[in-house]
Amino acid sequence: MSGRAVSNSQHAQQSFGSGPQLYRDVAELHAVPSPSHGALMDPSHFDDFAFAYQGLPDQPSLVSLADHAHAHASQSPTAFPQHQAMSGLAHNGLPFGALPAGNRSQSMDGSDAPPDRTSPASNALEDSTTDEFGLASRSRADATDLGGKPKEDKADATPAWSELKTKAGKERKRLPLACIACRRKKIRCSGEKPACKHCLRSRIPCVYKVTTRKAAPRTDYMAMLDKRLKRMEERIIKVIPKSDQEVASSVTRAVVKPAIPGTVPSNKPTKKRGAEEAFGPDLEAWAKAPSKPKIDGDDRPSSLQVQEAEENKLQHEGTEALPSKEIQEHLAEVFFDNIYGQSYHLLHKPSYMRKLKNGTLPPVLVLTVCAVAARFTSSPLVNSSGPEFLRGEEWASHARDICTRRYEWPNLTILTCLLILGLHEFGTCQGGRSWALGGQAIRMAFALQLHKDLEYDPSGRTGPKKQLSFIDREIRRRIMWACFLMDRFNSSGTDRPMFIREDTIQIPLPVKEKYFQFDMPAPTEMLDGQVPHPASPNDGQLADARENMGVAAFLIRAIALWGRIITYLSQGGKDLDPNPMWEDESQYVKHLNDVVNLEASLPSSLKYSAENLDVHKTENTASQFLFMHICLQHNILFVSRAAMSARKQQGVHDDFFSEASKRTFSAANQISELLREAEQSRCFVSAPFAGYCAFSSTTVHILGVISGNPNMKPTAEANLTTNVKYLHKMKKYWGMFHWMVENVRTQYRNALDAMRAGANLQDRAAQSSFLQYGDWFNRYPHGLSDAEFMDPATHKRKDSGADGVLEAKPELQSVEEYFSTLPTPQSVEHKDTIRAVGTKRKQSAKKQAGLPTQSGQHLESMQGTDADSVSGAQERRFSGGLGLPSNSYNPLAVSNAQNPAFSTAMSPMSPANMTAFSHHAHTPTFFPPELLAMNFGQGANGNIDPLDRQLVFGGYSLDASTGLGGGQDIMSGLDWDAVASGAHPDGGLQGRRSTAKAGMNGQAAGMADGAGLSGPEASSAWFMPFNMEPPEMGQDPGFNMGGIDPFTGVFGGGGSGLATPNALGGLQQQGP
């Protein structure tokens, strides 16, 4: 106590001389006698004084001491009871301003006065602006009221908490825990227990609140967002079905930052948990739980496992529909002999045949090959009563169902089946199916990345990448090029754009066939001529890329060029060309130069010659070799004929048109030469596009026939004979060629009429419309049906479900529309006859099937057959030949008012009705009801006797007395019977001037250059076999009427040039 008093007095002395006010206070103090320093500090004076807090640090400040010149002055001891009473009041909770009057300070003279500055009570309780020395201040000088450490405590001992160590073992510099009062006032707590200095000074309870939860570490804004995102993800995961959880496993999850070290939560549960504690177990269980049961040790993606499971099913699905092993092997040989390499180079024959014998081929591939090859076989095991092009439909239906169910999982097997099925549907006149299958194949090819030349298998299997062999890489390339060719074939129409762009295919062209068969790697060029992987001579490979390309590579280039020509001529390219086609800068001239340069760029081994053809025969590629050259010539024909439409335009040069005409007729003749060479070499060119090339050549030959040029006409007639014969052969295997043959028939008839009318050949060539190869889609969108032969007037329009979102059509009809829908009188007259014929078809069919082959029995059956049964049998036979129901067609229901589009429909007069659909079966003549209702007289005007007419098919001719004109006949000597049958006529025609002119390459065709046929002997004199049913005798159409063309209702137009049916499907030209 004495030490503190001394120090305090010294502090007072230092502060004493700080201002003039202090001198006045000192004078007053000296005026009052005070006890000595020893008497003041004598402990005897404090016997009855009890301190409330012994360690009160600011105790000296409660006692006013004055000392001047080292002399201590103080109040009398009577002041201490006052201080004790003040302390008691303060301790009892009384306010400091409520002190009693007796406790107030008294003046020195004993009278009441205002509190003096020297009174401790006034300093501490009443005057807050002055201290005990009278100095003005805002607060205590030592700041002890704020809990600060007094200045004299610097020498005190360190607090007890400083002796504690941190968890890291270091000395603690910060207070581990502050009391509640210091926290609220936000001041530093001394940390003593049970009460800190501030609480002791303020005389308030000191409470330390100990919590079990540690303060969460501060996190930044992004960490907070991560936690919120994590909580939202957990809520979403709980809603996701278990079947879809394998997809969620591959989704990137939100990442919560790990906790700061040292802040791991305690074991006691709290209200809020950390991210690791809240989500850790659930996330771990969710990540480890399998979505579906997997095979032990199989860690591949579930989608890949599903695809492989489907591929395993593909190895067995369709087994029940397979034919016998013998038929499978036979049809496989037929496929590689007649289909492989013509249009598509699909499948590797050594691998296919080896797998077929081992039974490791997928059944769907075997069904597809059998379906498309069945049309070309002559085996009795595969033969059916229907037409050839419908033989494999049963196998195709099973393969089609299997393929369409697996469009989600693309693989090379399904892709190959789609391409082959597209070709099959092309032959069965299923335009919609072929178009859809081709589009699906193209999408699947791009999904398998076939348009890229990859070295490793891109199927996505886990594990080490499998390097593709040369055969596998070549198979991938050929499948992609097959998709490219199918796109060009199917998209050659006016309204069907092409899907595959040439620049998207970054793969080389196929190698030669012998290299592919014998596994000999060789580099080839790309479509634009670049060599992606050139080989040096030291690599052991054939270094010349152009010499390594065979027929397949240049066939692809020819079809690609044809696609560009189609785009220019038929799909708007010509309209976008700013230059006219006869200018050198035009796109037309560019395409023309490309056509000529492509043929000139052929290697010496691929140029057309007899020697090269023999070489390709030994390699079994002669048909492909001929097909490639047919396509090259067809490009020249197609692009040259387009120039004829520009003859009447302004500024066209005559040389431009004449050169185009020469190239057109030269290319048409070359196509016929190639077809004739294929027939003589017994190399059947079976590609459907080859038939279209023959059709295009035929349209040019028709113009040559009516040209009147004596040098051009014989060649055109001979080539026309070859083309028509080839088209008749092709329509047995591809159904759409019935339509093309009928179109040729119509064009020929119209050309004859135009020539007799005095039309110019050049005008005729410019006005003639050109059929596109892809137009058959619109002709046969869903196969053959009754609508092909139904009278449009009897067809009632019905609302289709596909038009549900379109505008509602008006239900009212005008008078003209109403009368146009009424049936013709002839159809009403023969309505009962139609019903009677329909009921007798089956009986007639049975009767025909049971006809004996002996002549006597045949004559008896002919005499016992009535007209109705014969007519019914003929109708049934035609409908059955087309693969239709027996009641699908009736020629009597067709009226004379035909649709103009009907002129290209397949007519029962088509010669293929006998040769393609049945053996030695007679087809009915397609006469309108008006003609059948007439009863023509059978006068003695030179017509053949009825008995002879029964035996001589086509023995009806026109007489000079009919008055059908006496003009020159363009096809005067063309014997269409010989054209269709392939027979060579052995003599001239009697009763007229005739000659036998040899065709090109020594093939003779009956021709004559005089007037039209006339006289009774003007028929082909071809006698029917005795197992053939005779024609109907009830309505014998004798052509002895003047000025009447009985075929007007058939061909849709008048004219004297007639084309009548004969035994083998030729056009029997007749005229006056």
Curated annotation (Swiss-Prot):
Entry's localization field: Nucleus
SMART domains, per database record: Fungal_trans, GAL4
One GO CC annotation: nucleus
Keyword line: DNA-binding, Metal-binding, Nucleus, Transcription, Transcription regulation, Virulence
Disruption phenotype: Leads to a reduced ability to colonize the root systema and thus in a reduced virulence.
A Pfam family this chain is assigned to: Zn_clus
InterPro entries in alphabetical order: TF_fung, Transcription_factor_dom_fun, Zn2-C6_fun-type_DNA-bd_sf, Zn2Cys6_DnaBD
GO MF term list: DNA binding; DNA-binding transcription factor activity, RNA polymerase II-specific; zinc ion binding
Portion annotated as DNA-binding: 179-206
The keyword DNA-binding is annotated on this UniProt entry: yes
Role of this protein: Zn(2)-C6 fungal-type transcription factor that has a role in conidia production and also in plant colonization. Acts as a negative regulator of the production of macroconidia and is required for full virulence and the positive regulation of SIX effectors. In addition, FTF2 is also involved in the regulation of class II hydrophobins FOXG_02746 and FOXG_02748 likely required for plant colonization.
Note: In contrast to the FTF1 gene which is present in multiple copies in highly virulent fusarium oxysporum strains, FTF2 is only present in a single copy.
UniProt protein name: Zn(2)-C6 fungal-type transcription factor FTF2
Organism: Fusarium oxysporum f. sp. lycopersici (strain 4287 / CBS 123668 / FGSC 9935 / NRRL 34936)
